[in-house]
Amino acid sequence: MPAGAADQARDRAGEPVVELTDVRRVYRMGQNEVRALDGLTFTFRAGEYWSIMGSSGSGKSTLLNLLGCIDRPSSGSYRIRGQEVADLSDDELSEIRGQHIGFVFQSYNLIAQLNVLENILVPLFYWDEPPDYAEERARALADRVGLGGRLDHKPNELSGGQQQRVAIARALINDPAILLADEATGNLDSKTAQEILQLFDELHAEGKTILLVTHEPSIGRHAQHTLRLSDGRIAEVTHNREEPKA
């Protein structure tokens, strides 16, 4: 059984899910050093919905790669669900990604030869023994994103918005600690983008933790909170709307 599913029950609202402490990411170019992240300390808590914003060179992309366990910090601590991951090997980081992080990309990244149901199940292909509930959960997620009647459709038979819905369902198959969305509405028209943002709202209302990376202020303000970076540091934290009352 994926650890993400087992851990979901202990992601209580308000508890730390992602903890960054004095995180630095330094790139060396000859004799020069570029401090992409410069002493970042921040905590994302269960049930929160954040947008992460910043201009080119702010450290936004570097932070995205660290949060997604695609890269590791040069120094500092990065903990997911209490587990230190900053010093893990590539194979260990890959396992953490599969267990704790759900990705939604701008380009959907669906496999053309697979249908909707099969694409949703892709993250479980990497497990030696996919859980018995896998197909049932995939069907439920397809229903959840409004594609229960299109399980046999291939990506080229779906609109851009429908493909992104498949990508969101795929990202949720392991009950991740965080849903990490990178410019998730960037390839969509304004109407479809609003539909995807509405889906994020609904998932957040169900208790999902969402980190939405975007360069568009109107999209960023849609989240409850905004973390703005500049020169690898936190420049501003904005609370766009109050947390819903329990």
Residue ranges and their predicted role:
Residues 226-239:
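H-loop (His-switch) and adjacent beta-strand-loop-beta switch element
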Residues 14-229:
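ABC family nucleotide-binding domain
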Residues 1-26, 236-246:
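ABC-family P-loop ATPase nucleotide-binding domain
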